[in-house]
Design a protein with these regions (language model features):
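Active-site lining segments that contact anionic ligands and/or coordinate catalytic metals
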Residues: 7, 39, 111
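Short glycine-/acidic-enriched loop or helix-start segments at secondary-structure transitions
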Residues: 5-8, 54
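Catalytic cores of eukaryotic secretory-pathway lumenal/extracellular enzymes that build
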Residues: 8-14, 43-47
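C-terminal, flexible cofactor-proximal segment of oxidoreductases
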Residues: 30, 43-156
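Short, small-residue-biased leader/transition segments that mark boundaries at the very start
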Residues: 1-2
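Alpha-helical scaffolding within the catalytic cores
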Residues: 25-31
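N-terminal low-complexity, intrinsically disordered segments
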Residues: 14-21
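Short glycine/proline-enriched loop/turn "hinge" motifs that connect secondary-structure elements
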Residues: 32-38
Length: 156
């Protein structure tokens, strides 16, 4: 389960001084479930927007850790000091997550699951997991790397 509340309890501040809680006031927003716009060099594992909660969690954790490890290696090898998802990439990923889930039981109007944030009164109701499957998710992550970490800003 996404522990959005756990991340929000830690006073992690982004480059503009906003906390994650402030950044996510309208719901969690990530690129691939791995990074948050405005929080360079901060990686999340099994975050909202990833398929982790709908798969064997260990498989997803392993893929996330491998991807992050390879990414950090790439940053070091290329003397890149910061990586951050572009806001448009986050928007596009969230749109894709919702398009893939559209019409599924997960997004049915009668669904009151934590997948939609229904477990916490007042929490924004947005769909969080990627239902496209672990294989497709891995392919997308690999394509992003092959395209030079498309959707990310790399700063030297």
């Amino acid at each position: 389960m996404y522990k959005r509340q756990a991340l929000e309890r830690i006073d992690i501040r982004g480059k503009d001084g906003k906390s994650i809680k402030e950044e996510w006031h309208a719901g969690p927003r990530t690129y691939l479930g791995l990074q948050i716009h405005g929080f360079p060099n901060m990686f999340t594992i099994t975050g909202p927007g990833s398929p982790s909660v709908l798969s064997n969690m260990m498989v997803s954790i392993e893929q996330h850790v491998d991807w992050i490890t390879d990414c950090i290696g790439h940053l070091e090898d290329n003397q890149v000091r910061a990586i951050e998802p572009e806001e448009k990439a986050v928007d596009d990923w969230i749109l894709h997550v919702n398009e893939v889930a559209k019409g599924s039981m997960f997004t049915a109007p009668s669904c009151n699951s934590w997948y939609l944030g229904a477990n916490i009164p007042g929490k924004p109701r947005i769909f969080m997991p990627y239902v496209g499957g672990v294989g497709e998710y891995r392919n997308r992550c690999d394509e992003i790397v092959a395209a030079g970490y498309s959707g990310f800003t790399l700063s030297k």
